[in-house]
Amino acid sequence: MKHNPMVGEKLYIYTPCYDMWVSDVRRPYTVEAVNGNTITIREARPVFLGVCYYDTLPDYIEDDPNGARLKFRWSEKKQRWQESPAHSYPRVAVFGRWDWQPYLN
């Protein structure tokens, strides 16, 4: 079921790795803009986005002095918000679970 986020709403990002989910943020992102089936999210500071255990190199995003900004698009096929453009293991936006941070303290 599609979650229709609102500007200002918080979320976590997860990276599906084979059969496990790896948390790759230590605090929530915030929805900055909503445009149909695309959302733009922002972190308040430049961040390192986690890496699947099976990847060889970590996946960094640009060091934006205004904070990290990422775009996510709704996937009808997978019924989830995922990073756009998608990578091999596209990051997934998870709403309503801000206090759950598996593998990271």
What are these regions (language model features)?
Residues 8-10, 28, 38:
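Exposed beta-strand and adjacent loop surfaces of beta-rich binding modules
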Residues 37-44:
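Short, solvent-exposed secondary-structure boundary/capping segments
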